[in-house]
């Protein structure tokens, strides 16, 4: 099968952006998994990445100049995997749906999931096990936000109604921090509203699922390393990860996926505290956990099975995989040849104030920590880490 992987950031559609490192890592992982499954892979690559001699394992790599280029490729392939920020994914998916087979969530599902308020309401109605933390949808104005925060008490989380992942999300401990949090939402959101939610303690986890027309197949529970202080950011995770509530979460994830009519790979973010499982959001697209899972299962075969509606009844996970995003110290010597000599580096930094993303595998959960420490030392020896 000829498959076009259109990853927005690494294609250069957004220019030089902080999303490049994570975007290229996902592109490389998807291309590798599809190639390993015997498929012909087409993709775009940002010229600035190509000039560094960094290329994903694809059969045909082209330079993006306009959406017309994408439309030409779509007319000559059997299927497409679109990956983009949530506020851009809807239009991109609509274009794919008009041209070829889609490996991913349909546009109508993306539209539903892009509105956190709507998603919370659906989950509240259909969920047996998941709790939706207390929240309110408010305008991008200081007074109503201050009033609601005073009502529910600090700390609170302020985030865009239409955001994805940790983008534009802030942990707020006092009313003096609210103005800056609203500004941050306005920078990344196309909506004129935000969500204020009571902050909940717990372990950050996600459930990865893959969906076809007739089946929802839970793949794994994943740990998530989230930096909780002011600006909230994702730093990586481990897949699979033990969870005593796995069976209940798998059952509930199937239920939510069916109600939202998800397709392809998707992730459900959760907060687990004792017996309480709090729902955070649905990511209707391939997430960073896919990279870790590609170390322990045949993800390329599963992606194609979505189009063919031939998902297996279950999957075997061979060991444990992990993704870690390392922030780099300022003023380091950016030597790509040295960085890429570290095989675990799946995506190098593309700016002097960027990050690098590594992917490791181990037969045991405890071995993952050792593998991460080994790579961390290699990066530190190169002078990239503090």
Model-flagged regions — what are they?
Residues 145, 301-386:
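Peripheral (often C-terminal) accessory segments that flank ATP-dependent C-N-forming ligase machineries
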